[in-house]
Amino acid sequence: MQTIEQQITNIIEESLTDMGFELVLVKFKGVNTKVVEILIDSLNGNKISIEDCTNVSRTISAILDVEDLIEDAYSLEVSSSGIERKLVKFENYNRFLGREVKVKLKALLNGKTLYQGKIIKAENNKIYLKCAEQEVLIDFNLIKNANLVLTEEVFKKLLGS
């Protein structure tokens, strides 16, 4: 059986793609006060605006109301995935080739569970990182979580320098 997050993902992802957004993450939390948290990113690389979040929120709210997945009252929060966004899907690694990433693993790989380096390749369910000391090959299924890292290079691009 699918989790509520998976069910929500299945019913909203296509609509968000049609609107020009990537669904990065769905979180359902709370016991007494339920919250559906949605993280989005732009498919064309543009910054996410408050207006974008508002439009996505309206669309998702309408879909969730029709599908009636959540029995009780809930709050819906839509926000940008941010500069140090999570990399959840394998495809994300190809999109961010050359970017610095911090990867936490489910189990030891070469005696470590935490790696930071540039994404140099992503293919056949494997991620290739160029770390300070070496190149590392990581099986995607071994990744617990991963985030982009804000580097000076990225910061300068954001400032337009």
From Swiss-Prot:
Which function does this protein serve?
Required for maturation of 30S ribosomal subunits.
Q: Which HAMAP family match?
A: RimP (MF_01077)
> Which CDD domains does the record match to this protein?
YlxS_C
**One Gene Ontology CC term in the entry:** cytosol
InterPro entries named in the record: Ribosome_maturation_RimP, RimP_C, RimP_C_sf, RimP_N, RimP_N_sf
Between which residues do disulfide bridges form?
none
PANTHER family per record: RIBOSOME MATURATION FACTOR RIMP
Q: Which gene encodes it?
A: rimP
Query: Which SUPFAM superfamilies does the UniProt entry name for this protein?
Result: YhbC-like, C-terminal domain, YhbC-like, N-terminal domain
Keywords, in A-Z order: Cytoplasm, Ribosome biogenesis
Supply the name of the protein: Ribosome maturation factor RimP
Chain ranges passing through the membrane: none
UniProt superkingdom: Bacteria
Name a single GO biological process: ribosomal small subunit assembly
Note the Gene3D superfamilies from the entry: Ribosome maturation factor RimP, C-terminal domain (2.30.30.180), RimP-like superfamily, N-terminal (3.30.300.70)
Localization per Swiss-Prot or TrEMBL: Cytoplasm
Family statement = Belongs to the RimP family.
